[in-house]
């Protein structure tokens, strides 16, 4: 990896229906093989189910789910004198968002519902209510950081 220039961030175009940039990033993460129309159909279908089940604005449920899943602290490996320590560090806001999106999608794909639309809507509703595998992943990450708090002075 070149140290000369850091890659410049590309501008993300907001999605057509809700006009939200974070939702576009979410769709792009769901997308396989560049098939964005399928990813959009999955997300919008899941949002329709969320609206039916919760009687709330689906975008606010989505934002609440992201907030509940996003980690504030994580551990990173640091090698000091032959020993590798798991050092707790704060998570940057961009990485928090990316991790939350990734964990929600992974948890949704791991569910046993019939279609991805059902799985995604169920996982988003669970995450918005502080339940589900994505929230469990965040709690595990925080627990690891808490357990390794003694090594926090090795921060970089």
Swiss-Prot record:
Keyword annotations from UniProtKB, A to Z: Ribonucleoprotein, Ribosomal protein, RNA-binding, rRNA-binding, tRNA-binding
Molecular function via GO: rRNA binding; structural constituent of ribosome; tRNA binding
InterPro entries, sorted: Ribosomal_uS7 (IPR000235), Ribosomal_uS7_bac/org-type (IPR005717), Ribosomal_uS7_CS (IPR020606), Ribosomal_uS7_dom (IPR023798), Ribosomal_uS7_dom_sf (IPR036823)
Pfam families listed in its UniProt record: Ribosomal_S7
Cross-referenced Gene3D superfamilies: Ribosomal protein S7 domain
Domain of life: Bacteria
Record carries keyword Lyase: no
GO biological process: translation
Quaternary data: Part of the 30S ribosomal subunit. Contacts proteins S9 and S11.
Identification of the protein by name: Small ribosomal subunit protein uS7
Organism name: Beijerinckia indica subsp. indica (strain ATCC 9039 / DSM 1715 / NCIMB 8712)
Organism placement in taxonomy: Bacteria, Pseudomonadati, Pseudomonadota, Alphaproteobacteria, Hyphomicrobiales
GN (gene name): rpsG
């Amino acid at each position: 990896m070149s140290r000369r220039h850091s890659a410049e961030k590309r501008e993300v175009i907001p999605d057509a229906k809700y006009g939200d940039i974070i939702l576009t990033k979410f769709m792009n993460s769901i997308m396989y093989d560049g098939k964005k129309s399928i990813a959009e159909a999955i997300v919008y279908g899941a949002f329709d189910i969320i609206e039916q089940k919760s009687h709330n604005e689906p975008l606010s449920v989505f934002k609440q789910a992201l907030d509940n899943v996003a980690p504030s602290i994580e551990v990173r490996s640091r090698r000091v004198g032959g020993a590798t320590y798991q050092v707790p560090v704060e998570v940057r806001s961009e990485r928090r968002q990316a991790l939350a999106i990734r964990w929600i999608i992974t948890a949704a794909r791991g569910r046993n519902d019939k279609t991805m639309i059902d799985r995604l809507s169920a996982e988003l509703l669970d995450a918005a209510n502080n339940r589900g595998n994505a929230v469990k992943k965040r709690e595990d990450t925080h627990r690891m950081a808490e357990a390794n708090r003694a090594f926090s002075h090795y921060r970089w």
